[in-house]
Amino acid sequence: MTVPTDVPQTSATEPGAARRPHVVVIGGGISGLAAAWRLARLRHDLDITVLEGSPDVGGKLRVSEIEGVAVDEGAESVLATRPEAVRLIEEIGLGDDLVHPTAAAPRLFLDPELVPLPSGLVMGVPTDLASLARSGVVSPQGLARIPLDHVIPQTAIKDDVSIGEYVGRRLGPEVVVRLVAPLLMGVYADRPIHISMRAAAPGLFAAAKGERSLLQAAQSTRARSNDLVTAGPVFAGVRGGIGRIPQVLRERLQGAGAVVETGATVRTLRRAPRGWRLEVGAANATREVLADAVILAVQAPVATKLVKGLSVQAETELSEIETTSVAVVTMLYRRDDLPGGDVPEGSGYLTPSDALRPVKAATFASHKWQWIDDAASARGFVAVRASMGHADDVAVLQRDDDELARLAADDVAFVARLGRARPAAVRVTRWGGGLPRYPVGHVDRAQRITEALESLPGLAVCGAAFDGVGIAACINRAEVAAARVSQRLGQDGEWRHG
């Protein structure tokens, strides 16, 4: 592992004395850690403190072992077609462990079979109708409906539209149910009818505003994407798990002199005569922390409480950002128990929304990641991850862990035709309120919140509630927040306006 040597050293001091400006980052998830890291690289003269309320950093990025096999409990990959996440991985010294998925492709469950997805999808919108027809994913009636997109009048799009509503209107409901829903529910844990097209598919949204046909808009979006992206895999991972990223980030930050505290709940955030005053700690044992600038990098419900009294507009709009809960059930099967000694071919499967299955998607982790297969096979196992729960199915997560694990195992056995094979080891990870929902109007709401909070001197905001739930999107937003602080905070701790 190559250890970076160009990160400035910092040393914590109280604001006021022999002045090194003090910046506090509230939140030690990937957004908060990435903001602190970028700030440390931009400015050599700052004291940086990260305050995380939970026992560990990382937020939804976590990896742990199950029967000696390391498997991510949250996100397992980053988008490699944009630079932020890959660059960060390389900067913190994990570049040698950067890996890409195998060539195995996901399947779609069409009872009773797992079938390949058609090629050329743009957020579930088809661009290759011949491939779609060959796949059998859409019925003959559904296929006949799609070309009407070229002749029906253009659908007016104003500031935003539901992606489910828009695609359904242009291409028919089958495309939404069989293609758009499986792909988007895996990312947003929500039905397409509830998801903002502008937020979830900004490129397609922009193209659709200028095209009469959605099919044409999807084709132009795909062409632009191919022009902008160099040849290479779309996704990337880290050998040993994406969950290593926040742990190594913490080590690098601490090595650079930053303070990273866990179990440090920020209870209040208030303006001080100069900068900010934070109340930190347990309810009966709080302490005061002073900061010249603050980067708020927490989930919307937490941010709502912290901005109370600072901005009525931001507080109100943050309180309206809903969240949804999900669970990831990791299962290790003994190879000897599986029909043919393995799970079906492919990297896993997605389920259409009309299938009404409790598992919305399953990843055959041993097929998708060579490093997982190496570790699992050495112990005689095959690793599978099952994703459960979405905004319209909260009941499935009300089961206890044992019940949820049994339900996941039974459903995967049915869909993947595993017969009587059941996992030898199971791990249930719950992410309560883990994903912000992105309804129609989300982009404008996020902008209003940002403007309201960043009108306050010495405050910047980032996190998954704003510009995207993906790791790369979170890092990008965090780096923007860090740049704002770097540019505005003077060496004397004063905040420059403009």
Regions found by a protein language model. Name each.
Residues T2, P8, E14, T262-V384, ...:
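Mid-domain catalytic core of redox enzymes
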Residues E67-Q154:
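Dinucleotide-binding Rossmann-like beta1-alpha1 core, especially the glycine-rich loop
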Residues W37, R41, V63, E251, ...:
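Short, well-ordered alpha-helices that flank and scaffold nucleotide-derived cofactor binding pockets
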Residues A40-I66:
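Glycine-rich FAD pyrophosphate-binding loop
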Residues V125, A144-T268, L290:
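Active-site/ligand-binding neighborhood in enzyme catalytic cores
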Residues S31, D56, P301:
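Conserved Rossmann-like nucleotide-cofactor binding loop
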Residues R20-V50:
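N-terminal Rossmann-like FAD-binding beta1-loop-alpha1 element of flavoenzymes
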Residues T2-A18, P118-S119, P126, P344-E345, ...:
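Conserved flavin/dinucleotide-binding core of flavoenzymes
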